[in-house]
């Protein structure tokens, strides 16, 4: 039942009602075999998307980050779409080595318009210092290292790391759950990568 309440909340937020409050609810008997569930819903204002402002970004121009978002001004604000596209902004930063980026969306309500202000703290770019490979009992380490699309000294790039994991899996020696972890090693945010095959 809790999942149903969460789905109802998500439905409202997908349709512009970002302040929706679901509950409390009451269970009332209907005869001997049935019950009725009465759920109180406070919808709040239905907001339309009013645009995005961005501050704190230095690496990417604001227009490039805004292009990630597909909602059109005047459309009902869709929380699910916004959250997915915000994850895409994070991925964009991760792919350039900004694994410590922190983005805070602030919602500014002007009438029935919702303007989103993204406050970005990019922090330092992470360089890879060393790559450690563990769990290998099937082939020479150099065979695995040839599959890596990243090297010590490179900036961490999420897509290259994911392709490296796939390349290692494609060798056919290892299970698909090749795990990757990283350890910060200095105040600049540089990292050592740990690949467990």
Regions found by a protein language model. Name each.
Residues 1-197:
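Periplasmic polypeptide-binding modules associated with outer-membrane biogenesis and secretion
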């Amino acid at each position: 039942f809790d999942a149903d309440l969460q789905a109802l909340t998500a439905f409202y937020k997908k349709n512009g009602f970002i302040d929706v409050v679901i509950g409390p609810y009451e269970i009332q008997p209907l005869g001997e075999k049935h019950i009725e569930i009465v759920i109180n819903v406070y919808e709040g204002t239905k907001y339309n998307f009013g645009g995005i402002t961005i501050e704190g970004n230095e690496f990417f121009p604001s227009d490039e980050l805004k292009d990630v978002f597909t909602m059109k001004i005047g459309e009902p604000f869709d929380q699910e779409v916004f959250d997915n596209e915000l994850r895409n902004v994070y991925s964009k930063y991760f792919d350039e080595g900004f694994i410590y980026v922190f983005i805070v969306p602030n919602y500014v309500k002007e009438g029935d318009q919702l303007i989103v202000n993204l406050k970005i703290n990019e922090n330092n770019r992470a360089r890879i210092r060393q790559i450690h490979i563990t769990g290998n009992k099937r082939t020479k380490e150099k065979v695995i290292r040839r599959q890596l699309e990243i090297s010590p000294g490179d900036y961490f790039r999420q897509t290259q790391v994911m392709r490296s994991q796939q390349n290692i899996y494609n060798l056919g020696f290892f299970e698909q759950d090749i795990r990757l972890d990283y350890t910060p090693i200095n105040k600049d945010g540089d990292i050592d990568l740990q690949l467990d095959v």
